[in-house]
């Protein structure tokens, strides 16, 4: 189990308050605003995956900065760090994403720095090339599935999700998702 220092705890509380302020500006796409049938199917699989995680009798899932502190301070079956959500979401939506003819990959921002954050990207490769994902506009079909922030199946336009980070120390990178043997 990794212990955090008092300074890290104070920084986490500060970041949490910043996230509350940021959350008022950038919000997830509302379910009723999703018109693309493929994304609607992905959203249903995403919602089911989050529900399954939160109701899993073998693991205790949490979310957000307070969830991070909970996971880091307790041993056992606690889950909820952003990379753990990334793996769980990837596993839960992969077959649905592929059935829609879409692709998925991982994304990380601030890799190796304070505020590192992981999530899953889904996109329609017929409408945007993989090499262009990080430069997508709101009008392009590139979406972030991020259950970590609120423990809910939140979907963001990638261009908006990138603005949620208060400080970008390391630019966003696409990453392959390889399921670990254990989420610990």
Spans of features found by a protein language model:
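C-terminal motif of bacterial Sec signal peptides marking the signal peptidase cleavage site
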Residues: 20-23
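Second-shell loop/turn segments in exported
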Residues: 32-36, 68-81
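Mid-length scaffold segments of soluble, non-membrane domains
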Residues: 73-115
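Hydrophobic/aromatic-rich core segments of domains that either
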Residues: 98-154
